[in-house]
Structure formats: C-alpha cells, structure tokens
Amino acid sequence: MVILPVSQLSTNLGLSLVSPTKNNPVMGNVSERNQVNQPISAKRVAVVGAGVSGLAAAYKLKSNGLNVTLFEADSRAGGKLKTVVKDGLIWDEGANTMTESDEEVTSLFDDLGIREKLQLPISQNKRYIARDGLPVLLPSNPVALLKSNILSAKSKLQIMLEPFLWKKHNGAKVSDENAQESVAEFFERHFGKEFVDYLIDPFVAGTSGGDPQSLSMRHAFPELWNIENRFGSVISGFIQSKLSSKKEKGGEKQSSNKKPRVRGSFSFQGGMQTLVDTICKEFGEDELKLQSEVLSLSYSHNGSLTSENWSVSSMSNSTIQDQPYDAVVVTAPINNVKELKIMKVENPFSLDFIPEVSCLPLSVIITTFKKTNVKRPLEGFGVLVPSNEQHNGLKTLGTLFSSMMFPDRAPSDVYLYTTFVGGSRNRELAKASTDELKQIVSSDLQQLLGTEGEPTFVNHFYWSKAFPLYGRNYDSVLRAIEKMERDLPGLFYAGNHKGGLSVGKSIASGYKAAELAISYLESNKMTEETI
C-alpha cells in the first residue's frame, strides 16, 4: 500500500537504459531457422515467473520480435497484483495503486494503449497519519508542514535549519559506499527523531512493510542517498535537483511531443488486475504457460558460437518437458531461485553464494460498513499508523479508504476499507486468524473513523512473503545477483529484489532485464556474422 505521495520523499530507484532497435516480426517454425546465422527475431527466450516483472520482460521481448515462452507455476498470472470482484465489491489483495515514475512504465502504457483505463483516486492529496490516537491531515507541501501541528516547534526549526546544521554520518565521508546506515539514522541526522517517528516510520511501513531501523538507506532511498553525497544537505540538494530537472524537461518539451506522465497514484478501471489482463492478452496459449513449474535450467555452451545454449525443464499436468532457449530471464523471488536446480556444461552450478533474504508477512483485511455506521468518515486516500501509536491502542499499519478513492468499488450505501496488518512491526500478528484480525481492524477503525458495530463484510488474505526486506546487508544480495548473471551468460534477473519494491519499479526491472537479454543476443549475432 502507498499513502504518502512518493514525490515527497523522492524515491526513484531506477536507472534508464537505451531501448534497443526494433526488429523484424517473429519468424514461423523455430526448427526451420538457420542455426548458424539466425536473425535475432528467430531467437527464443524463456521468462520464468509471470508476476508483473515477468510480464513486462516478456512483453518487451515479444515487442522486439523475439520468440517468448513465459512460465508460471501458479494458475494465474500477475503475482501480487490480484483483484477480486464479489458481492458488488471490487478490491485488491496486493498492490492497490501505482505511479508512473519510470520511463519504462510510460513506454508500456503507450504501447498497450491502456491509458483510457487508468483510474485516478478522488482527493488523493488528502492523506492522514495517526497522532495521539486520532487521524491528522498530512500536509501536502513543506510550507503546510511548517504550519501544521503534526510536528513540534523544535522539529520544525530543525527542518528549517537542515541546510546549515545537518550532520555527517559518524564524521566519515558521506559518500563512503561501505556505510550501512539505516533509514532511521539518515533522517534523524538531518531532521530529528520526531520526523522519523511520525513521518518516515509510517511511510516505510505503508510502502514496504518495513521499519526505518532495519531498512538500508542506500537501497530504500537511493536518490536521497545520492543527493546527500552530492550536496550534503537534503533540502538544498533536493531544490537544486528539481531546478535542474525542470530545465531538462523544458528542453524535452521543445524537442518532442511526449505525452505527460500521470502525476500521483492511480489504479485501473476494475482494479490492478486490469493491467495484468491487458498484458496477458498479448500472449498466445503457447507463449504463456500457467501451472507450469520450472524444475531446472541447464547451460550447455562449450565455447562454440551455436544458438540455444539454454535448456528449460518444466512440469505441467505431471508431464515434464525440456525445451531449448537462447536466453533466460528469471523473475522468481530470489529465495526460490536459490533452490532452483541449475546445470552449467553438465556440472551442477550451486547458488549457495546467494544469501537468504528476509521477507515480511502481511495480512490484507477488507471490510465494509454501512455509511450510517461510520460517524467520522474521512475523504481522501487513507491513514497510516506510526509505530508509536501502538501505545494508543492502534495495531494496524494503516487503512486505505478504497471506496472514497474509487466510488465504483462498492455500493453507494457502504464504505469499503482495505487495512494492513503485520510487516516487520508485528510479524506474528500478520499470521493471526480472520476472527482475531477482524476484531483488531474493527477496533482501529472505531478509534480512527468512528465506525459502530460489526463490519457487514470481511475478507482476509495473507501474504507470507509480501516484501523482501532491503536490510543493511542488502549489498550482499545484489552482488550475488550480479555474480549469478556474470557466471551464467544469457541469464538475467528481474523483480522487486532488484531495483525497488513498487509496481512501477518492478515493471522497470523487467524491461531492463529484457533489454540486457536483447543486447546479449544481438552481440552474439554480430560475433557469429564476423566468423
């Protein structure tokens, strides 16, 4: 879930890559193509995992003329994008919204022609956090923050003086890449502890299920980390970066007719599943293989420049099948990849060097209340609950006002709420029973919104591994992924373990992996042609 505007904390995790040149349409029968000097359009690429990263990677590969097979062990595509329609209600059990903060998302939307299906939330700038047991409207800009009562006068003064009084990390060079500073330590150095407790803490809980003490600043907020490296002061650096960005955008407007990106968060008509379904329509039955579990990967390159160095073994309906490919894009969770059987030139290739990644559990509870039984309804996006508010009896991470944002998600006489419980704050509570969670959610909503009586509808969905935790040692995970890609030519990794947790970052990760695969295949083709 995302409640705070991402732009307030500038959490761009992506790196742009130059898009490869479009190629000819896909050729027909694979067995008929020239093995010595194939056009790239005859190459075959396997994509393992049909979450949003896998779908994006497969779409990018196919749009460049490649033969693609997308393997998914589950009976449905989309991963953690999952919309349910039931009893006149529409809700998402995974991500509820996304942003268009990455150019890869813009490219995908334009190619799919899906913009007419975008659904913008009503009053999305009205977002709340709990303070002293009650919801408080979150200021939408720095000036409003200084005028509000959300922070003490001391904290406001520290924010205003940050350009002059910010502190370096333990007196060391700020740009020391070995520093494993937490999100809490970083923001406390710049803005103080209250800023962390009542703004950063609920934000990271709402976007990643994490807590600021456990998250790595460099990996959770790399743009702000880099701003400090360049400018020292976060405020000064942010202002200078924005001014520079405006100049660049001004130049782009004069030289191109690019469509402006959607500002803020949005969903789709019918929920986030609409994005998944739209992408899936681009693939035939032979390309998108559901309930097909990949058992093993085998790399057989022996030094000669021949195609189809990869073999993918998969099982569907108790039938095991081996198929040859020229490259593989893997998008499964890294802990699952670690357990995958891989052979390299007929020898087992161990992935023991990949560290275990801690993943955070999350329960999603959907409730409805008759409007007459909600005495203090709030218009807007939702409310986040800081960890400190547990002392005031609040146990949830936050609640989205789903039918306030999107009125078509529920009948006109009820309010639909989406509440989140668990994360690193309370892993055990995430695993509680539906009845227990119903009582917890009802209690929090009664305190925050004045709900009365029992909800008229309850649905509970549990994600045992909702988010990977970008902890202080996350460098070791990224180095392991790089080693895997380096040691296994033609294998590329994508997903929310690499590049960011949001839907947009996951799409960008899939696109970038596809671009690397295309570059790899083009490079091999050029080498073959010179021989």
Curated annotation (Swiss-Prot):
Its EC number is 1.3.3.4. Residues 1-48 form a transit peptide. GO terms for molecular function: oxidoreductase activity; oxygen-dependent protoporphyrinogen oxidase activity. Keywords: Chlorophyll biosynthesis, Chloroplast, FAD, Flavoprotein, Heme biosynthesis, Membrane, Mitochondrion, Mitochondrion inner membrane, Oxidoreductase, Plastid, Plastid inner membrane, Porphyrin biosynthesis, Transit peptide. It is an enzyme of class 1 (oxidoreductase). The keyword Metal-binding does not apply. Pathway: Porphyrin-containing compound metabolism; protoporphyrin-IX biosynthesis; protoporphyrin-IX from protoporphyrinogen-IX: step 1/1; Porphyrin-containing compound metabolism; chlorophyll biosynthesis. InterPro entries: Amino_oxidase (IPR002937), FAD/NAD-bd_sf (IPR036188), Protoporphyrinogen_oxidase (IPR004572), Zeta_carotene_desat/Oxidored (IPR050464). Binds 1 FAD per subunit. GO terms for biological process: chlorophyll biosynthetic process; heme biosynthetic process; protoporphyrinogen IX biosynthetic process. GO terms for cellular component: chloroplast inner membrane; chloroplast thylakoid; mitochondrial inner membrane. Catalyzes the 6-electron oxidation of protoporphyrinogen-IX to form protoporphyrin-IX. Belongs to the protoporphyrinogen/coproporphyrinogen oxidase family. Protoporphyrinogen oxidase subfamily. PANTHER family: PROTOPORPHYRINOGEN OXIDASE (PTHR42923), PROTOPORPHYRINOGEN OXIDASE 2, CHLOROPLASTIC_MITOCHONDRIAL (PTHR42923:SF44). This is Protoporphyrinogen oxidase 2. It comes from Spinacia oleracea.
